Amino acid sequence: MTRFSLTVLAVLAACFGSNIRPNVATLEPKTVCYYESWVHWRQGEGKMDPEDIDTSLCTHIVYSYFGIDAATHEIKLLDEYLMKDLHDMEHFTQHKGNAKAMIAVGGSTMSDQFSKTAAVEHYRETFVVSTVDLMTRYGFDGVMIDWSGMQAKDSDNFIKLLDKFDEKFAHTSFVMGVTLPATIASYDNYNIPAISNYVDFMNVLSLDYTGSWAHTVGHASPFPEQLKTLEAYHKRGAPRHKMVMAVPFYARTWILEKMNKQDIGDKASGPGPRGQFTQTDGFLSYNELCVQIQAETNAFTITRDHDNTAIYAVYVHSNHAEWISFEDRHTLGEKAKNITQQGYAGMSVYTLSNEDVHGVCGDKNPLLHAIQSNYYHGVVTEPTVVTLPPVTHTTEHVTDIPGVFHCHEEGFFRDKTYCATYYECKKGDFGLEKTVHHCANHLQAFDEVSRTCIDHTKIPGC
């Protein structure tokens, strides 16, 4: 939690009796790492426990999620056997290192209960006191309020709830954070200037702009859209240095309607199949995806989109193709560098269990390393190089699909149909990656010899 000097604190306490957070920038970028307690129950490499967290790569680790008891309005353990009886919360705080250990209350199903609790003074008091008691008992350093789906009618009560936390946090070092949605319709439900005064940081859920619920494929978290969301909150009064940008450590996946229609905006017939660990349609954790790519490299075409700081893969089977939007260490490193340069507070990651925490594809935590190595004050460094183990390719080799360009070697190659389009093929973490480029206009064509765009009449067939 950001603090004034002792003198200023004394003046504020005398004048206001408040713990309101100042709007001054902090020096260290934040990496807010969300940990889902239920991943303890997964099997194999998908299982994760607090001891598996590398807290040197996170400034804040967030234990999620807690609820609110509908009858008593006290904070509620959602898995009491794991959290309490198996001492999972204690293990979490005991292994926090130098990171701030926080709890997250709420989530996608808690909006109605938040509304009821925040509406009554006595309920607010009960909830906040029970939360502070739990944090103190188990050694937590702060709380994230994730009131998803908050309505405009709840705006004033949300501020009253934050004010109650502020009152109980007085003379402590507890950290206060809130999560804000990325949906345009929700922006004005939040009194952003007031919220900014009460919190140390705001976690903006700048992810899942599309997914398998849509009938066309696209980047799930394109950087321009993420920045647009952050700027929308900034225009409404949120200081940049108090906003962290959420990034996914998972992929959104689709089944393509036609195998030879693989571009952004092409139609999908449904969600991609479930992963081994996460067991969710249209969703793969990074550690599920990297294992799959390494096992069947020849079946994947990976395309990098520099304009959107994005990457996607097409995985071709014998009878269908999957379209996979994901993040890698290069996209995350570039985003970390750019948001730091623009004055934002850092990133939040969703979630640690989706990272390669066990190093099944190479070095441990490649995505977190990429973020941290590109953060500080816009200083550009190369992302940490991940050493990948030798890959044993399957004997299956996917036949090129007519109308779809595939990289077979490094270099620059003109499209066979549209001469003004060309492809750059270069080695990446998982084999050859393709980047699509276009000449300035349709009267030009790409010359593979000079590697420049020239008059199309000078190239036979163009």
UniProtKB/Swiss-Prot annotation:
Expressed in the upper digestive tract. Staining is observed in the ventriculus, and in very rare individuals, also in the intestine or esophagus. No expression in fecal pellets neither inside the rectum nor defecated outside of the body. Keywords: Allergen, Chitin-binding, Disulfide bond, Glycoprotein, Secreted, Signal. Residues 404-462 form the Chitin-binding type-2 domain. GO terms for molecular function: chitin binding; chitinase activity. It comes from the Eukaryota. GO terms for biological process: carbohydrate metabolic process; chitin catabolic process. The keyword Secreted applies. Residues 29-378 form the GH18 domain. SMART domains: Glyco_18. It is found in: Secreted. InterPro entries: Chitinase_II/V-like_cat (IPR011583), Chitinase_insertion_sf (IPR029070), Glyco_hydro18_cat (IPR001223), Glycoside_hydrolase_SF (IPR017853), Glycosyl_Hydrlase_18 (IPR050314). Glycans are attached at N338. Probably a non-catalytic chitinase-like protein, which binds to insoluble chitin and enhances the activity of the catalytic chitinases. Has weak chitin-binding activity. Belongs to the glycosyl hydrolase 18 family. Chitinase class II subfamily. This is Chitinase-like mite allergen Der f 18.0101. The lineage of its organism: Eukaryota, Metazoa, Ecdysozoa, Arthropoda, Chelicerata.
